[in-house]
Amino acid sequence: MKHYLRGQLAKAARLNKETLRYYENNGLIPPAQRDSNGYRYYPAETLVLLEFISVAKAAGFTLKEIKELFSALR
């Protein structure tokens, strides 16, 4: 299973690291797993969530609405 470091995920999703941190801190994406080296690793599924967030934002949804949608689906 593929995993991304924070910088790799940010680049793949065309976001900056601060945005990933914001999304993580606000519950839009699950927290990264930390390895013994202290690096944060995200599973590949996180990229799918980020792509959905991007599409939903482009469609006019707020981050609050997106978070509520994710909560309803879980």
Q: Language-model features: where?
A:
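Basic helix-turn-helix/winged-helix DNA-binding cores
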Residues: M1-S71
